[in-house]
UniProtKB/Swiss-Prot annotation:
This is Catechol-2,3-dioxygenase. The keyword Oxidoreductase applies. One of its GO terms (biological process) is response to toxic substance. It catalyses: catechol + O2 = (2Z,4E)-2-hydroxy-6-oxohexa-2,4-dienoate + H(+). Involved in the meta cleavage of catechol to 2-hydroxymuconic semialdehyde. Essential for growth and viability in the presence of catechol and probably involved in the detoxification of catechol. Induction: Strongly induced by catechol, less strongly by 2-methylhydroquinone (2-MHQ) but only weakly by chromanon (6-brom-2-vinyl-chroman-4-on). It comes from the Bacteria. Keywords: Aromatic hydrocarbons catabolism, Detoxification, Dioxygenase, Iron, Metal-binding, Oxidoreductase, Repeat. GO terms for molecular function: catechol 2,3-dioxygenase activity; ferrous iron binding. The keyword Ribosomal protein does not apply.
Amino acid sequence: MTSIHEDTHIGYAKLTIRSLERSLQFYCNVIGFQVLKKTDRQAELTADGKRVLLILEENPSAVVLPERSVTGLYHFAILLPDRKELGIALARLIEHGIAIGHGDHAVSEALYLSDPDGNGIEMYADRPRSTWQRDREGNYVMTTTAVDIEGLLEEAGDERKTSLPNDTIIGHIHLHVSDLKEAKAFYTDVLGFDIVGNYAGMSALFVSAGGYHHHIGLNIWAGRNAPPKPTNASGLDYYTVVLPHQEELDLVANRVKHAGYSIEETENSFRVKDPVSGAYITFVI
């Protein structure tokens, strides 16, 4: 198998929501994004004023489905540069009265919440890569224990911010899929991501580029053979994967076409439908 380039990373996610005004209040005031560009029905959000991290598109008639009922978004994950910034974000969430879940995953500390349309969000900070451990099979050792909430808040101290730091990125995307075997074939054999977590006991598979703990999480927690998200539902429409140069874009596109998947190409991007989550992936440089 040919691995995807080590400098590959997630770009942004595009979501359908029901009310742009309500969502902007949440994503800007609570999460800390800034509006980069806005029309009547769509907004592009950023942390640094330059790079798009999230696109919201309004569909007032969009249906909000019960959790874990279809394939598609489990959560998109906002990666903060350090533990202090995660603590500052936590304090902001608490001040706004947001319901928060949390998990210490050994490689990272994470907070979990949902937007007004039920789209899952993770806000997290990585621990130093030198501390990440792998088991005998090469899987990263990832746990789910309680985050030291008091310690996070102590890290933040009295510092409060209304916006995300400039070097915030989308660290990973986690998807409900219909079949893990097919997901493995598509994401590893076709796209070229490396398996970094084959967690059969928890019905999940984590893949990445360049040794990261995961750029894409895949699970069957909505049920094996779960149906795809209807087109009239809120949720993830597509996400982007950023490749370092045109040569890599051509290599990945050729692998996808050779495997029999249809793609939509432009001069410096292509789009393919993920057969197991129903979301589209746009590869860009």
